Amino acid sequence: MDIATNAIDCIHTTAASHGRVFIVELMGHKVGWLTLHAGIAGGADIILLPEIPYNFDAVLMAVKQRNKAGKRFSILAVAEGAISQEDAQLSKKEYQKKKANSPFPSVSYELGKKIQDALGQEVRICCAGSYAARRQSGCL
C-alpha cells in the first residue's frame, strides 16, 4: 500500500510543473481496494476501479473542470482491471477478443490516448510495479 500511495504522491510535482495528465496504473485486476485506498491517500484526482465501470465522458469532464479551475494537471489512479461502461456491456468472449486485438497493452494506455486526443494535453502512463507493491519489507 505504501508503494502504491507513494507512486501517486511523488508524481504530483512532475504533473504540476509540466501541466500533464498522469495515469498511475496499480494492481487490481478484479478488485480495486488497493487503487481506491492509494488513490485517496496519494491525492489522485480521479480513481477508476474494476467494480464500477467508468464513463469516459465523465472522466474527460473531470479533467476539463480541473483545467478550467486553473489546475493544469490531473492524476488518475487506475486499477489494471478498470473497464469502461461500453466494454462492460460486451460478453466475456467479446471483451477478451477486443483486448487481444487492441494495440494498447492495458486500459491505462487506451484511456491515455483517448484523453490526449480529446484535449490535446500531454498524458503520461506510470505502471507502479505490481511486484514491488506485493513485496514484504526488507525484500528490496
Name what the model sees in each region:
Residues M1-H18, F22-Q121:
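Accessory alpha-helical/coil subdomains and C-terminal extensions
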Residues E110-L140:
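C-terminal active-site/capping subdomain that shapes the small-molecule cofactor and substrate pocket
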